[in-house]
């Protein structure tokens, strides 16, 4: 049941991971159904021998639920042979096997970087059998997200504001769009 979620920031990967935890709990695949979110900083320590313990602690807290590792590719930095990220991956692979009956691991990140992560350890790629890509939202979808978030907060988006936001979206370069953050960017736009 381990999964790989790929896509840009703000496309719903964490939100879907939370929903998967609830669904798997209701279906009886998981005993507790909690979602433990972490990233490289939650798994990698600064000194030899500390990383394996840190990974073990995080995995133990996720037993019965889902361990969601955001930006998992950061564990497999190329050209960093003395980096402890590879130790974290090695430990994770072993623990995924040891606890395969009551732990789901979901790793998430950018598509290209996730390929590098999955091929960084011979046993890693075979542990994941479900791959879900989260495409960027269209401008129309982003506008709907803006309006939905505004409504939740008791606001209505005026036609003038819609025009300004749509103009902002259509005027973005590809690089700016990558940094914008999709739904997260719309939430931030509303808060401004």
PLM regions and their residue ranges:
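Hydrophobic positions in the central parallel beta-sheet of the AAA+
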Residues: 3, 36-38, 67-68, 105
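Canonical AAA+ ATPase core
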Residues: 18, 73-80, 89-135, 140-143, ...
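Conserved P-loop NTPase "ATPase switch" module shared by AAA+ and STAND
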Residues: 39, 62-82
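Short glycine-rich substrate-engagement loop in P-loop NTPases that contacts/grips substrate
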Residues: 31-62
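Conserved RecA-like P-loop NTPase ATPase core
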Residues: 14, 38, 55, 70, ...
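Conserved C-terminal "switch" segment of AAA+ ATPases
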Residues: 27-32, 116-119, 134-179
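The conserved phosphate-sensing helix
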Residues: 173-192
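Walker A/P-loop
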Residues: 1-33, 57-60, 128
């Amino acid at each position: 049941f381990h999964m790989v979620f790929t896509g840009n920031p703000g496309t719903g990967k964490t939100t879907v991971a939370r929903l998967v935890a609830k669904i798997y709990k209701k279906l009886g695949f998981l005993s507790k159904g909690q979602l433990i979110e972490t990233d490289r900083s939650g798994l990698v320590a600064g000194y030899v021998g500390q990383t394996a313990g840190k990974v073990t602690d995080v995995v133990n807290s996720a037993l019965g639920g889902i361990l969601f590792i955001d930006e998992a590719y950061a564990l497999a930095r190329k050209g960093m042979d003395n980096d402890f990220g590879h130790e974290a991956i090695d430990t994770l692979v072993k623990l995924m096997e040891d606890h395969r009956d009551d732990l789901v691991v979901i790793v998430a990140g950018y598509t290209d970087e996730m390929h590098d992560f999955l091929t960084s350890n011979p046993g890693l790629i075979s542990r994941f059998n479900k791959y879900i890509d989260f495409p960027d939202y269209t401008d129309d979808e982003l506008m709907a997200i803006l309006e939905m978030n505004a409504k939740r907060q008791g606001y209505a988006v005026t036609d003038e504001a819609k025009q300004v936001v749509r103009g902002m979206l259509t005027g973005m370069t590809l690089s700016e769009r990558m940094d914008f953050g999709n739904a997260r960017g719309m939430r931030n736009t509303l808060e401004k």
